[in-house]
Amino acid sequence: PLLFQQDYESGVGLQGMTPFPKEMALGAANSPELAYKYGKSVALECRSLGINWVLHPVADLNMNPLNPIVNTRSVSDNPEKAVCLLSEQIKGLQDNSVAATIKHFPGDGVDYRDQHLMTTVNSLSEEMWKQYHGKVFAELIKKGVACIMPGHITLPFYQKERINGYLPPATLSHELLTGLLKKEMHFNGVVVSDAMTMAGFRGWYKNDLEGQVASFLAGVDILLWPSYEYMDTVEVRIQRGEIPMERLDDAVRRVWAMKERFGLLNKNRELIRPVSAEEKAEIREAAKEITERSITLVRDEDHKLPLSLEKDKKLLLVAVTPVAHKGNDRDFKRLQNLRDEFVKNGFEVDFRRNILYEDQGWQDNATEVYDKVIFLVARNTHTPFGPLQLWDDEAQSVWAANSMDKSKVIVISLGSPYIGNEYFERVKTYINTYSNDASTHSALLRILLGQLPFKGKSPVNLEHKLFTF
């Protein structure tokens, strides 16, 4: 029987399925009960498609606000909170016959670089690693997580073996996968690699095939996106005695045990389990509740909120978000939906993308023309690739916001939670939503209008030393 695997961060991302907010929203809602419902909901919708294994959740910690890949994909920078919420999310998945995967061992979120582009480093000392990432992985192993995905990340305090003078990533490190993870940490589940196409993995050997074989030898049981030649090559090298049969036996035992654990060996198993109307309603309610409980008021020092049609009728909404890879303008299009939500609620809205330097004369008058100027900042991972800071036109919008009368300015981040203190520390009203989707927009409007209270608590330290001078 086959394992069918998907990524499915933020819910099952297909039409007709239920979108969930980013993982950090779960951290802001800070409810183990909702974490379980999140996992269960994703599992039920996965089962309706025949999916029995997800590469989720992210178990990395946001220790470096400049990390471009973890950010809102992670629940927190706090290991205790991460263990509490992730263990329930995993339980929700696995109680409902979907294998969970935690990633990216030995832990991302320390480096300021992206393992899609290069091999990155978890530079923590042994003591610090055991207090942070090591603790999260160790505790979730004890809780019974089925799979672990190593990242293309090094762990210098532990590693000694080198390839061409450099420490290899975990996906190529026998020390980290077999020595640390399988033996010292007693992980008996399946090790599934991160994508073989990422630059953090490629280029360590003369060709991709040799790297893939080396990854299997290091302790990866299932490779994500290897070449077609990979399996035949492993078979031939086992027959020649170049790869120990014990390595294959270990991988087979782990994969077989996972299939048995999740019922794939049961002859009466349901390949596809439809979601009932009652379950669908519960799933939608879970996503809605997480979203409503996550939106976080970081500060409202001059009491601009709640908004009302009496005092805030005329609004300028400024969309601050870059064009993503190959012209993908998803975040901007979603912000247009948020504009429509304001209009539906009776506001007179002008909407524009960024305020540029050449508009300086116009921007000086903006706070006289409008009751409020709201900067909607959507800076999310890989939209586009690169650091999560603001550049070019978006940076000019920061210039504009900080040049305006702050009594009229509100900043809302629909992505990275660090934007407010990084760029807008003098803006007195600042909100984090963690996600940029229709459900978040709807909840945000109700909260801005005072129909719902702010309930979210920041799951990460916003007063990070990087932003304190």
Predicted regions mapped to residue ranges:
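Active-site-adjacent structural elements in enzyme catalytic domains
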Residues: 1, 32-48, 250-253, 257, ...
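Glycine-rich, aromatic-flanked loop segments that form ligand/cofactor-binding clefts
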Residues: 1-18, 42-62, 82-109
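Structural recognition of the beta-strand scaffold that forms the well-ordered cores
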Residues: 2-6, 10-12, 52-57, 99-104, ...
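Active-site-proximal loop/turn and secondary-structure-junction residues that shape catalytic pockets
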Residues: 8-10, 59-60, 106-108, 152-154, ...
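Preference for extracellular/luminal or secreted protein segments
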Residues: 14, 173-174, 183, 204-469
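Surface-exposed, active-site-proximal loop segments in enzymatic domains
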Residues: 16-28, 64-75, 114-120
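Glycine-rich anion/phosphate-binding loops
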Residues: 28-44, 79-83, 127-132
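Second-shell residues forming the walls of enzyme active-site clefts
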Residues: 77-226, 230-236, 240-250, 254
